[in-house]
Amino acid sequence: PIGTTYREAIEATGGFDCADPALVLGGLMMGSMSLNLDEPIMKTSTGVVVLPQEHHFIQRKLRPAKAQAAIGKSACDQCRYCTEYCPRFLLGYDVQPHAVMRSLAFTGTGADYWNQLASLCCSCGLCTLYACPEELYPKEACDDSMAAMRKANQKCTGPTTVKPHPM
């Protein structure tokens, strides 16, 4: 019921199998992570996945944004899998997560151009959780680019017509 804490709800269904649980709220792909088991269930709460804090997925989610960018800056090999798997790219939108990852290696020069390549990202997480063979963070890089665009009050100026990928 609404207002019940996640801890109470999970204990009512059999409890935890691990000593240090972490919650993924809203699904693994687009959901958020919480370590607060006493957070109340709200009307908008959806799926809950309980994993131990030492689980690989949780460790990736706990990595600070600065570390994610540093890893992406040094390890992205520009394989383009993140772009080729992107559902928005396949629909014909000019979303290029691989190019946004490339921009991590640059200084602030040209940020307006690189940010545009992330502006139509739907943040589904497919690139980060499935497509990238290096286990990098293209979704998070796109999220950061979109946040920078919002902060600078920029709008997407890309093409207005789309042509679906012939796949």
Q: Where does each model-flagged region fall?
A:
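Redox cofactor-anchoring modules in respiratory/redox and cofactor-processing assemblies
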Residues: 1-134, 139-167
